[in-house]
């Protein structure tokens, strides 16, 4: 009896590791994973949080079926949790796990769809700056869509985690106990830095609140690394990631696009571009301060009148659509924030 025909799988296209974090939403995950399948990375790390109850099990199983379609030569690692830990510390745990097995890695959540050139771009950046401790991360998301730079990427101290990459040296430096908060001198320097550069002032409070929970929040750990080490991130001159997060049921953005202020809405609708290779590298490592200032305007950081305008725009959009429960909830949260009752958890 003849042996069954063996079909050779196509080889990996990019020698890079990719970590995908997902939970129970198969539809957006399928779009992200399709981009990964086309890119054919050499190593794949799949991390899924456990169910909160019976209601999650169907979505969890559907997500696992999505990521089982690995039809290229790829080293696959799976870490599927049986108990739900929540976004935090799941993100931190996933990254610690992946970087125990690889030195360089791309991190994608189930709502960040990268362009195809994002993968070789990250590969080249991860190799080129592997030993440069000034560089903390490689970002795929450019919040301004395009940036006027004569090179294919530039440097910033702004942190964007919608499709990014980093090194084991960075993740290993994270302190999940936030012990640096016990150093009065470090805290004074950080407060002065935040005040002098209009960097998100709530992040210091967030780090304090995160420490109080006893959980590791990777966003505040990454932020504190950037600030305390005067680190820089690499940003492509053209945006390379489309984010699907602003939909009902998403973890961080529960509203629809139609009630989001126009400037913020643009971040969820801008295209993901391809870069041409070979890349044009900047001959120096200096922060593009103008980009950071543009991002501050986008997020209304240090721009109170822009923030007021955004709040009024969002209120009007919700009023037009009769979403009075959303308005009431936002008002209650605003009052609680004024009273100091809102915790960053």
Question: Model segments located where?
Answer:
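Peripheral/terminal regions associated with large enzymatic or DNA-binding modules
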Residues: 2-108, 112-345
């Amino acid at each position: 009896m003849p042996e069954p025909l063996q079909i050779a799988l196509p080889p990996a296209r990019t020698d890079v590791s990719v970590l995908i974090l997902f939970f129970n939403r198969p539809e957006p995950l399928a779009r992200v994973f399709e981009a990964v399948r086309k890119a054919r990375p050499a190593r794949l790390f799949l991390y899924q949080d456990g169910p909160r109850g019976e209601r999650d099990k169907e979505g969890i199983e559907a997500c696992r079926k999505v990521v089982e379609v690995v039809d290229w030569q790829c080293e696959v690692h799976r870490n599927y949790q049986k108990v739900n830990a929540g976004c935090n510390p799941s993100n931190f745990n996933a990254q610690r796990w992946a970087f125990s097995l690889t030195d360089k890695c791309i991190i994608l959540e189930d709502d960040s769809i990268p362009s195809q050139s994002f993968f070789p771009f990250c590969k080249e950046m991860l190799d080129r700056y592997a030993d440069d401790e000034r560089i903390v991360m490689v970002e795929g998301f450019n919040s301004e869509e395009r940036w006027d730079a004569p090179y294919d990427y530039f440097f910033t101290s702004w942190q964007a985690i919608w499709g990014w990459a980093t090194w084991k040296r960075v993740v290993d430096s994270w302190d999940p106990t936030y012990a640096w908060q016990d150093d009065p001198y470090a805290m004074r320097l950080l407060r002065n830095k935040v005040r002098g550069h209009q960097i998100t002032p709530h992040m210091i409070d967030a780090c304090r609140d995160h420490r109080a929970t006893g959980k590791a929040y990777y966003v505040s750990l990454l932020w504190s690394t950037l600030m305390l080490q005067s680190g820089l991130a690499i940003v492509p001159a053209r945006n390379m990631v489309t984010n699907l997060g602003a939909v009902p049921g998403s973890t961080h953005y529960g509203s629809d696009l139609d009630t989001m202020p126009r400037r913020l809405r643009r971040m969820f609708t801008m295209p993901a571009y391809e870069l041409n290779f070979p890349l044009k590298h900047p001959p120096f490592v200096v922060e593009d301060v103008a980009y950071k200032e543009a991002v501050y305007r986008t997020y209304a950081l240090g721009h109170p009148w822009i923030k007021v305008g955004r709040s009024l725009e969002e209120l009007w959009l919700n009023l037009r659509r009769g979403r009075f429960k959303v308005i009431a909830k936002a008002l209650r949260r605003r009052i609680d924030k004024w009273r100091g009752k809102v915790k960053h958890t």
